[in-house]
Amino acid sequence: MSMTAEIISVGTELLLGNILNTNAQYLSRELAALGITVRRQSTIGDNHGRLAEFVNEAKQRCDLLVFTGGLGPTADDLTKETVAACFGDTLTFDPDEWQKIVDFFTRTGRETTPNNRKQAMVPVHGHKVVNHHGTAPGAWFEQDGHCAVLMPGVPHEMKAMWEESVRPLLLARQSCALHSLTLRVLGGESNLEYRVRPLLEKPNPTAAIYCKTGECEIRITARAQNDTEAQTMCRAYAKKFYDLLGDAVYDEDVAGLEETVVHTLRANGLTIATAESCTGGMIAQRLTNVSGASEVFGYGFVTYWEQAKAKLVGVDPAVIAQYNVVSAPVAAQMALGAAKAAGADIAVSVTGLAGPGGGDAVRPVGTVYLGAARGDKVYVKKLFVSRPDRALIRARAAQTALEMALRLAQGKTPAGTQVLAESAQHDPAALTALDETLRAE
């Protein structure tokens, strides 16, 4: 039977909504990957009595309590003292931890204060969990088959402690080997879930879907007697998803679509440029987040004004006047012009209405046109985001542009596009046909 867990986030600022709780999401996924069933997520304020009552109740529900937050030096940082008491433990001063704190303050040009000594208190019967990235050590307590692990609330410190210390500790307690891999899949969650539903019901390996903007992750986890067997099980199960989804599965174990785009461009000796209007450089930013992007990406044009579109990437002002700046012909000329100006093999373009104002009956807010040029052709697509959320519209547009770039880098035709020859980019009949076809979608 698998271990059960509860994630407990401590901090009044979380209850007030002043801080977004990203720790709970991260830990839920990490625990699931270890085969540990998360029964509940809870948020508790900085109050000793309420926290103690909650801990004693949670011990009856789960094998493992995972805490984040409340390990600081101030009077309202109560997690360590409270959990220690609930687990029948006490705390003692650790000179080594104190010296680390003193050294940290010295490096940053500050002086310690008496309340900083609080962070150097560690369990007597349990053990400390070393924090290599901050001043607050974590803690591990055990009593009557129940465990509690305490980690800092600062996300980067918590993640580092989890990866370096807590995850290996939990793995060592498992009586089997676990292996996970993550498939990155283009498309929405509801359609994907419908297509792969039978594969989500198997107990081992398990598969879970996590929704992102314009794509999903499928995390596959296998439990076996040894790591080799677990890897083999994961690989075989992943093949079932590939068989169902085809090239909608674009990669495995990558941070995002931009990473795959950059790697594919590098593998094929290709370069890319961008011409962005409503996304304002988001595509370029995502590409340059990837190490090694400088080998494939040299030019990014942010052409917010109509004059910029004409001056930087050669859009014909007459085309803007006839078809509107948010149109398929403009997206086509932006992509072709960016490729030419940058000397790039591939270029993507975006022009759209992110709102909240500016829309009309023909082009409501959420209307976006995208172009992707390679060689003597440009592929143009219309995207409509029905929810009038500026951030979402821009994010979806950037994601779609990267998807189109990936398909061109793979030598494929981007789905849902209309093609225009480079030689026809100034042909009134061809531009009108392109405009009418995509406006009708």
Predicted regions and their residues:
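Accessory alpha-helical/coil subdomains and C-terminal extensions
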Residues: E142-G214, R219-T221, E229-C234
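Glycine-rich beta-strand-to-loop/alpha-helix junction loops that act as flexible
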Residues: V10-T12, F67-A75, P152, R223, ...
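Glycine-rich oxoanion-binding loops at beta->alpha junctions
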Residues: S28, A32-E57, F93-G134, A308-D345
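Short alpha-helical segments enriched in small residues
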Residues: E229-E441
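Proline/glycine-rich low-complexity loops and linkers
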Residues: R50-E53, D77-R173
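Glycine-rich phosphate/diphosphate-binding loop of Rossmann-like nucleotide-binding domains
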Residues: S2-Q41, T228-T232
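Conserved hydrophobic helix-helix packing surfaces used for dimerization/oligomerization
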Residues: A5-I7, A148, I272
